[in-house]
Design a protein with these regions (language model features):
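Periplasm-facing N-terminal accessory domains of Gram-negative outer-membrane beta-barrel systems
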Residues: 2-7, 13-111
Length: 111
């Protein structure tokens, strides 16, 4: 009886994770400088122009950013760090279950 309860709980936890993953997408990537070195601490903003909502993350020590659990829509990504030009990429379509890899190379200049 106890084993069947544990099995049922494990199934429900697994099913909820699968459902959550299958109703959203993800965007990730690496940000580097003109020399090809990765850049930590870069602010990456995901903007939904339809709802005017923004989610922001920062790159880690490997220059990697990950934005998980994104609802399907068309988004704009904005990348900013002091001393570099801001980069904006529009028209990024996130679909159910998609995993989009979008890398950026920063250019030295004003924000």
């Amino acid at each position: 009886m106890r084993a069947s309860r544990l099995s049922a709980i494990a199934f429900l936890l697994f099913a909820s994770r699968v459902f959550a993953q299958s109703t959203a997408g993800e965007i990730s990537g690496v940000i580097s400088d003109p020399s090809g070195s990765v850049v930590p601490g870069v602010n990456v903003s995901l903007i939904n122009p339809s709802t005017n909502t923004t989610r922001s993350v920062k790159t880690n020590e490997s220059g990697l950013y990950v934005i998980p659990a994104i609802q399907p829509a068309v988004y704009t990504l904005k990348v900013e760090l002091s001393g570099f030009r801001a980069i904006e990429r529009k028209g990024i379509e996130v679909q159910v279950g998609s995993s989009n890899r979008i890398d950026f190379t920063l250019e030295v200049g004003e924000i």
